[in-house]
Amino acid sequence: MSKVSFIGGGSFGTALAILLAEKGNTVSIYNRDKKVVDDININRRNDKYIKNLEILSNIKAFDNLEKATENTEYIVLAIPSHTIRSICKQLKSKIKQETIIISIAKGIEEHTDKRLSEVIKEELNNPIVVLSGPSHAEEVVLKLPTTLVVSSENMNSASEVQNLFMTSFFRVYTNQDLVGVEVGGAVKNIIALAAGILDGLGYGDNTKAALMTRGMKEISRIGSALGGREETFYGLTGMGDLIVTCTSNHSRNRKAGLLIGSGMGVDKAIKEIGMVVEGVKACKAFYELKEKIGVSMPITDILYKVLFEKKDPKLGIEELMLREKKSEIF
């Protein structure tokens, strides 16, 4: 059995920590919030992020990064995308070079437009594996069948992580297309936020089907331009993740959109969710990126205006509907 350290004690990180602990691994969780650490260690719960859940005895929490990662074989980065670089800088002097870094965050770095594995690689010389796909913590802890994907520049490391997580209810595939896996997971948050806005405005199934289908095209378009393979975007980390994030009541991006569509301001909606809404950051980052490289992403354009220029969402939808006539396939 292995020692696995989770950086971040949020809902999905906690769900995966329990999965690995149930397989007999020794698991540590690093969290800066002393209340979360004490709740895990003393009460065997993590009620701030996922309620009514028992934390196994072979999981220990720390508010000290060095202690949490001591002699660890795997580090799971279960933190928001904008904190990845700073945490990796802190880890550099604390971990062994052979420790495998597993990223479960979804997004790109603002201002640099770098994928998260690229950010990690700039700061650490360790093997890096990305774990992504359609998965909500609330269903993982119930052991409902879930399928994800691991990808890496080193497929031996990817296979190792595949074996680490694989169970009878948690199936993990490998995919060599690291770019496609990361981009799909990041852009779908933009479309999920838009899907929530549609729900908040009271639009129906026809509208959401159109949004998801044309949103899938935007994922494929920007992903291919960045070097990803189109077939990846129609797999688990693209279409699969898009479906679950646009339709699930567990999705914080959809829930934030729902609040915005119902008339709540963007900042207030994010505060109401209480956790990072990656779709907001992703929208800004990919809007700036697609402007640089000349990729058409009309849904992202409109969502950017709604989020950052206070455009009326209904007028935005009308603008999308009245765009120049064209063929569906282009």
Curated annotation (Swiss-Prot):
**Which GO biological-process labels does this protein carry?**
carbohydrate metabolic process; glycerol-3-phosphate biosynthetic process; glycerol-3-phosphate catabolic process; glycerophospholipid metabolic process; phospholipid biosynthetic process
Compartment(s) of residence: Cytoplasm
GO terms for MF = glycerol-3-phosphate dehydrogenase [NAD(P)+] activity; NAD binding
Q: Where does NADPH bind?
A: 11-12, 32, 106, 137, 252, 276, 278
Residues noted as binding sn-glycerol 3-phosphate in the record, renumbered to the chain: 106, 133, 135, 188, 241, 251-253
Record flagged with keyword Protein biosynthesis = no
Active site, per annotation: 188
Primary role: Catalyzes the reduction of the glycolytic intermediate dihydroxyacetone phosphate (DHAP) to sn-glycerol 3-phosphate (G3P), the key precursor for phospholipid synthesis.
Under which name does UniProt file this protein?
A: Glycerol-3-phosphate dehydrogenase [NAD(P)+]
User: Species name for this entry?
Assistant: Clostridium botulinum (strain Eklund 17B / Type B)
Q: What is the lineage of its organism?
A: Bacteria, Bacillati, Bacillota, Clostridia, Eubacteriales
Q: What gene is behind this protein?
A: gpsA
